[in-house]
Each structure stands twice: as C-alpha cells, then as structure tokens.
Curated annotation (Swiss-Prot):
Phosphorylated by protein kinase C. Phosphorylation of the C-terminal domain inhibits channel activity. This is Potassium channel subfamily T member 2. Residues 1010-1030 have a biased composition (Basic residues). It is found in: Cell membrane. Are normally in a closed state unless activated by an increase in intracellular Na(+) and Cl(-). Inhibited upon stimulation of G-protein coupled receptors, such as CHRM1 and GRM1. There is conflicting data about the effect of ATP on KNCT2 channels activity. Intracellular ATP was initially report to inhibit the channel activity. However, others studies conclude that KNCT2 channels are not inhibited by intracellular ATP. Residues 1111-1122 have a biased composition (Polar residues). Belongs to the potassium channel family. Calcium-activated (TC 1.A.1.3) subfamily. KCa4.2/KCNT2 sub-subfamily. GO terms for molecular function: chloride-activated potassium channel activity; intracellular sodium-activated potassium channel activity; potassium channel activity. The gene is Kcnt2. The chain crosses the membrane at residues 64-84, 102-122, 138-158, 165-185, 199-219, 257-277. Sodium-activated and chloride-activated potassium channel. Produces rapidly activating outward rectifier K(+) currents. Contributes to regulate neuronal excitability.
Amino acid sequence: MVDLESEVPPLPPRYRFRDLLLGDQGWQNDDRVQVEFYMNENTFKERLKLFFIKNQRSSLRIRLFNFSLKLLSCLLYIIRVLLEKPSQGSEWSHIFWVNRSLPLWGLQVSVALISLFETILLGYLSYKGNIWEQILRIPFILEIINAVPFIISIFWPTLRNLFVPVFLNCWLAKHALENMINDLHRAIQRTQSAMFNQVLILISTLLCLIFTCICGIQHLERIGKKLNLFDSLYFCIVTFSTVGFGDVTPETWSSKLFVVAMICVALVVLPIQFEQLAYLWMERQKSGGNYSRHRAQTEKHVVLCVSSLKIDLLMDFLNEFYAHPRLQDYYVVILCPTEMDVQVRRVLQIPMWSQRVIYLQGSALKDQDLLRAKMDNAEACFILSSRCEVDRTSSDHQTILRAWAVKDFAPNCPLYVQILKPENKFHIKFADHVVCEEEFKYAMLALNCICPATSTLITLLVHTSRGQEGQQSPEQWQKTYGRCSGNEVYHIVLEESTFFAEYEGKSFTYASFHAHKKFGVCLVGVRREDNKNILLNPGPRYIMNASDICFYINITKEENSAFKNQDQQRKSNVSRSFYHGPSRLPVHSIIASMGTVAIDLQDTSCRATSGPTLALPSEGGKELRRPSIAPVLEVADTSSIQTCDLLSDQSEDETTPDEETSSNLEYAKGYPPYSPYIGSSPTFCHLLQEKVPFCCLRLDKSCQHNYYEDAKAYGFKNKLIIVAAETAGNGLYNFIVPLRAYYRPKKELNPIVLLLDNPPDMHFLDAICWFPMVYYMVGSIDNLDDLLRCGVTFAANMVVVDKESTMSAEEDYMADAKTIVNVQTLFRLFSSLSIITELTHPANMRFMQFRAKDCYSLALSKLEKKERERGSNLAFMFRLPFAAGRVFSISMLDTLLYQSFVKDYMISITRLLLGLDTIPGSGFLCSMKITEDDLWIRTYARLYQKLCSSTGDVPIGIYRTESQKLTTSESQISISVEEWEDTKDVKDPGHHRSLHRNSTSSDQSDHPLLRRKSMQWARRLSRKGPKHSGKTAEKITQQRLNLYRRSERQELAELVKNRMKHLGLSTVGYDEMNDHQSTLSYILINPSPDTRLELNDVVYLIRPDPLSYLPNSEPSRKNSICNAAVQDSREETQL
C-alpha cells in the first residue's frame, strides 16, 4: 500500500519562510471563495413571508392588527346605523341605499383599503400555484364583498351611500381570532388545551350568528316596522332561546326569509360545534386534562407513574398515603399511558377521592405530559413497575426509562422507584428510594424458614394501622393480635424525647429495657447525627448521645401521645377496667398495648399489687430454685456479655471428633467471591474452602465425585429447605445469603434444595457453588416423583415461589390458580409439611389450605368483610395462613415504598432486618423458642430483662401457636350437630363462664373450651341449612364423615408410598397423615410487659453483631477464602 504522506509533496522553502514571517496573512491573497448560505431567504417575497407568517412575534402583531381592524369596521357599521335617521316610506330603495356621512365614509374606505391590501398580500405570500384556491376561499370572498364597493365609491361618488354588509366582517374577525390564538401559543411557547380552543370557537360562532341576525333583520325592516338595534337584539335572543313571545316580529317577507335562513344556519353550525366540543370533552375526561399551574404552586402534590393502573394498586397507594395526618392536604396526580378502566373511574368518582386525586393519561417519557402533571413542582414522584407482565425484564426497562425521563425533566423532584429484577437496580441508583421486589421477596421467604412468619411481621410493621382491627371480635386472640398489629416504627431525637431523654449517657440495652418497662415502647435502633447508617441494636457497648436519633416500635409516635401520672390515671379510672379476665393487667401495660394516646408513667415507688412477680419457691423446694435475673446495667460490663443464645449454646460449633471425621468439607467465613448481579450488598457468610464442581450441585444426578441420586442418600443431619421456582433468577441468590450468614450457627444450617422448572444458568451456578449444602434439581411441584426425589418427605419447609409465566391472566385474580391448586395438592399429600407460598394477589390467600365446610374459616371471612367495611388497610390479617406466615404476596410490601415518603428510614430498617444489608455494629433478626425450662421467666418484661442483661438481645415480638383439638373431620360436621351443641351450651351458661380463660394462658387444657367458644361464634355468623332430628342421626353422620376422611387419607398415603417404592426410595419416616392437632398461630408485635409467656412461643430478637465484641474484628471481615489464612480467620471470628 502506498504511503499517504508520500503522495503530498512538501512546500518549497520560500513558502515556508514566508509563512513563518507573515503567519496567517500570507493566506489572504489566496484563491478562497466566500460562501453565503440560505440565499433563498434573502428574496423580497421570503422576507415578507418571514415577517407576516413565519416569525412568531411579528405574525402575532399582524393578526392582532387585522382582528382589531375587523372589529373597527363592525363598530363603524353600528355607528352608521345609530346615526341614521329613520326614513319614511317602504320603498325597496331603502334596502340598497343608506345615509352615510362623509367622515364616516372616509373611515370605512380607509379600513377597506387596508383590509383588502393585507388580504391580497397574504394571498400572494401563501400562493402555491393554484390561483383559484386563493380566490374561492370564503374569507377572501367576504373581504371582496365588504371592501371593493368602498374602493369603487372613491372613483364613483354616487355610490358613496350604497349599502355594504360590513357587519359580515364579524366572521372575518372570528377567523383572525383563531389564527391569533394559535400564534399566541407559539409566541409564548405554551399550548392551551384543544378544549379551550373549541370553547372559544363555539362562543365566537354564537356571537357572530347573533350579531349577523341583529344587523340583517334591522336592515331588512327598514321597509317595514323600522326596528332599531335593541329591538332586533331582543327578537334574536327570544327567537334563539325558543321562547318566542311574539311582541316583536318581522313584517316583510325578506326579513322573515332571512330569519328562517339564519335559523337553518344555526341548526347546522351549532350542532357541529357542540359535537366537536362533546368529543373533546370525552377525550379530556380520558386524558385527564392538565394539573393547574396555580394549584401546583400553592398546593402540594405527588405524582404516581404507572404503566397500567389496577384498582388494587390504586387503593393500596391511596389508603397508605392518606393514612398519615400531615398528607391529608396533598393532591395525587396519576400519570398513566392507558385509559382509565371502569373500576378505577368508579372509585375516582367517590367524593373522598375525586377532590384530591387527578388522573392524567400520558407518558412519563414525554416532556409535554410531565409538564401537564407539573412534575417540576411535585413533592415526590412514585414510579411503579407492572409486575403482572410475562416479560418482567421489559417492565423494568420501562421503569428505568421513566425514572431517567423524570430525573432529566425535574432533577430536584425526589424519586421513589419500584424495580422488579435486582440486576436492573444499579441503573436507578440516583433515585432517592428504591425497592427491589425480588430482593425483598426472597430474603423474606428465606427468613420465614428460620424465623417463622417473618413475612407477616414485616408486612404488619410497614402498614399504617391504629390497632383497632378485631376489637369487635368475641375471640381474645383476635383482639390481642389486632391490637398489636397497630405497632409501627417511629423516630425521634433523644434530647427531644420524653421516652428516652433520661437515658443519655446510658447503654443502648439499658435504654431499650427501661423504656419498654416504663412506657411500653421498644427501642430497636439508633443513628448518630453525623452518620447516615442506622444501627439495629448496637449492643450494650453503645452509649446514647443527646443528638442520637432513636428508632422505636409503638402504637403511635411520641408527638401524638399524652403522658399522665399513674396516680392521676388511677383516680380518673377507679371504676373502669380494660380487661376482665382472671389475670388482670396493670393499667399502664394495657394503655401501652391498646394504642391509646394516654401512656402511663409508672411510679416505681407505688407498684400495683396485682402486677406479675416471680413466685418464691417453697422452703422444701429451695434446691429447685431458678437463678434470678440480673439487672440491666447503665453501662454494661462487656466482659459478662454472652454472644450466644439465652437458652441453648449456639455460639459456634465445636464439633466432636466423630463429627469431624464424618465431615469432609471445612467451612470458612468470608464474603462470597462471586455475585450474580451488580449492586448486591456484600454479606459475611459461611463458605466452602473450595467451590463445589457444578456436577455436584445437581441433587438427583450422580457424578464422578458422589453417587447420590436423591436427598435421602445424602444423610443430612438437619431437615431440608426446598424452594420451588420457575427459573433460577438473580433474586434467588438473596434466598441463600440470609440462610448462610455468618451469624447463623453452623450446626443449624439447613440444606437448601432448589426445585427449578428450567435448568439454571452457568453464572448462577458460579454464585452458589461457594455455599455449603446448596443443591438444585430440575423438576416441578406438579410431579410427585420430583417432589419425592428432592426430599419433600423429610423437609422442614417447602417454599413455593410465584411463577412469572402465570402472573398475568385475562380474568382478575386467576393468575394464582395453578399455584393454589398445586399447593393444595401438597397440603393434602403431605399434611405435616410446612408450606410457605407466594401469591400474586393477596385476595387469593383465602384459598390456601381451603376447607369448603370449615365453619371457622367462614367466620373469619365474615370478619374480614366487616374489617374492610370499616376501612381497615389490614382486612386480610385474620386469615389463618397469613397470620401464621404460611402465605405472602409481594404486593403487600408496596406500602413500604409509599410509607418511605414520610418515614425515609423504613427501607433501610427493613433491609437490615431481612439481612439484605449488613452494617458493622448493626444487629440482625433471629428467634428463640420458649421451652418448659424457660417458663420460670413467666412474663415478657422479665424475658426482656433477662435478654438485655445476659446477651444484649432486644425482643420485638412473639410468634404464638395455640393448639386446636378440633380435627378436620369435626370441623365439617353437619349444621344440625352444631345447633345441638348450641342448645347444650345454653343449658349451662354458668358452667361455661366459669371455665372461660384468656387465650394467652399457658394451661393447655383451656384450648378445647376456647375452640368451642370459637365454633359458637362461627355458627352464629354462618348459620344455614336444614335441621335433623335426634342425637343418633348426628352421631352417625359424624362417624361416617370421620370414616370417609380416614379412608381418603389412607388412599393418599398408599399412593405416595407406592411411588416411593417405584423410585427405590425408603418409606421410613414418611408421615402417614394420621389425625394431627390443628394449630392457630399469630404474631404479637411489641406486646405489653405483663404478657405471659407460653410454651412453644417463638420470640423475635434483634441480636447485636457478634463481631462487634471482638477486639480485632475488622481483619476478620475481609474475604479470606482464597488464601492460606482461612483457618486462622475463622477461629478469630467465632461467635
């Protein structure tokens, strides 16, 4: 190839020397040509066109002048009519000739000359090759009719008094007005709605019709009654209003014919205008019009951007947003590209919402629509993804573009964004608050397996409630559960707080325990003034400062509370009692738990005699006396603080020699070396020394490293956690991480089996191959063989994740149909299996573990309807699967994003509780179970003290399970038996009252009576069906039903066993599904200090970071997997 540089010869030396001396001047005499652009605009015609048409401002001035000129001509016509003396006689000459003074004629001629010249000039400038198109236009014809006679009269004086219908210039004025409005919008760069233009055209058309009719009748009646302008106006108004009094009527046939013609014109023109106006009005109703600029500057509003608006999403947003008192005056502007559906339209017509919710149809990607919503003046913008889409990634991409568009248009508007896929989160890091659906969903489902009902706990915390749900119910558990559900997270500065001000300089655990003991509030976290990180239970080493921001759980925030001394409260409530059970609670405890604004300040010098105290052991039982509870120190002695569980040694696994020889894999602690997506928070975890080969991750396939083909062959010491999902998305990574976090005891790690419909990608396997005891298997919960191979018969929990391919359905709420039926099949086949299900729609949770003839479930359905009628945001909370944490819908967490508008810390606290974020010094959520050996503690307050003084843990709630000895078959007895029991109960009401006890009692013998009372209440709410006579018939019916149920269970058991034998699996340990006790589980968030502990209660704890107790904890936090010092690091970071 020829070198390009060699093709250009160098300059001679003299030119180079000249260039050195003269610089750029040496180029002045060269042959250069100056080129001028846009020469076509320099012609005379183009300059005129630029001035009269193209230039916005000059064109506006010309049209305004033209409009004024036409109005002036009409005004001169009126002046001529008023100055003219009525002529005598009825000759037709009066129609063609009028009396016009010379000055008036001169003015009209001048106006006509200017108008005609302007019309001809504009016609010339807009000429496009067809002269007839310009001549035959109606405005041009009217201009000729009104201007040419005056110009002719200049040269022919006898025509000066010729009648010219100058009043027709009103139509030219209307035409000029329309053009002027368009130019005005262009000049000020502001577009009015088409509705405004159409209304203006309609009004101007109506005025022109009336003015033309007035002037025409008045002129034609010059040969008749000689009406003046006022009489003509009166006649036109009466005629057009269809009243027609008949006192003023035209006499000549010409005027009558003119009236008929004008009425015909009106009947043609006005309906067309009204039709266009009605069409624009309907379109405006669909699109929503504009949000007023004046309102945007004087009132506060937020914008909700969604791709499609469903009624459930709308009501969740409105109920949660307007639940806060200070947001009552805010407007909500909804910006949605689709047309409003019928249900949404019906709701927005309710006066409560129509006054403060505005629906705009438009796209967030259009600046014009963002301007309509006044996004630059909005207090916040909520951007939600459409989760009911087959392609969720595409939905995320739309959300990302909306967020970018809003940030570009209004950079100062706070953004609250909901994203579906975690891999898309890093695109919107600039947003003020982001909730990633799959991150929260999988982390919550994972914690449900080790901390039961974590999903219910978080859902209740992020919903705004006053704790009034269930207070009308006759069942005590529903009252207590509903009352405690009103607890939320609030914040306050320590020095401004009555709750915590006295604990300045004290330890965190001391402040938390005494605040709960005194006020019933639970201090769970703190944040330094100069630090943005929130610390959950930083432990006893943390000393409270005056400027610290305290985060606490309570029924209401401190600012809305009033404080009364206990003596004053006792005097004002001598005859009042909040509770009439056997174990009466002190007033200060009940007020704190009931959620009233009056909170007792407990007087330590005057303690209620009925308050709970530890019973002293008898003299003969001193050898069995339990150790007393140590006091919580103001400044804790950290050398005495244990980093283990209260009741069992879970500190770290010192394995026995037998276990060491049987264990082939050594675990280390460190950060996972590979993350499946950008933006995942690093978490200190239990990891393997070396990653597992991909072939060994397959549970049901043997390889060269192991020969196991089913879960039973692995011989796991702990029960399995099975996750049934459609695909191994990146969000599934967040299910594994909380279960392998470093603070989980190694001995308690459960094997995780991923049952996937589709094989996982290689990058996902790269991420999970470092975690111990994580396997996958390709299969479906539709297939019994797949379930048996993955170890469902000895699994602790089965998590069924909602499938993306079924999230959208043509009929509302049918998206969960397949999931519900599959889970019901699992429930029938493996009744002892704990199944945790995710649904798309919360309304479908009523179908979980469905029993068609269960009266108690029917009664709960009635209760849910009543709570919804009372306006509760948590009407679904009394459904037994939700209360027990067996079912969850991610849409219930939408309120987390909405609540962040008022509580900007809620997302951070929720992420810390779920283990999605880990901050050095911040605690983590865990649980402990109350056994028989722990019942000596007796009350929640003493448990609080025991935990704070020994381990530094802070309890935040109780998961309570009550036994129900009514079997499934007994719940399906006939109505006649129920009514017979009703009659039996009525016969002995005194005995029934004497046996009634509180549901919080620890005596297990009370539960049958409680269940019997529940059945009575259920029968009252759902009584129906014919009566049967005789006790024998009822007993025979019940026996037949029990026999039918037993035979059905035996048939299912035989089916499962036969499949296991066919697959070569051992049937040992399979639950043959004998009658088992049904249970009722629910959560008590921040219960009162005097709540009695019961057997099998699970207490939610926020445990301090174990690494914060180590003197050299920072080096142990480094990733130490791929170096030789792993073992030393593991020893240093033991709990």
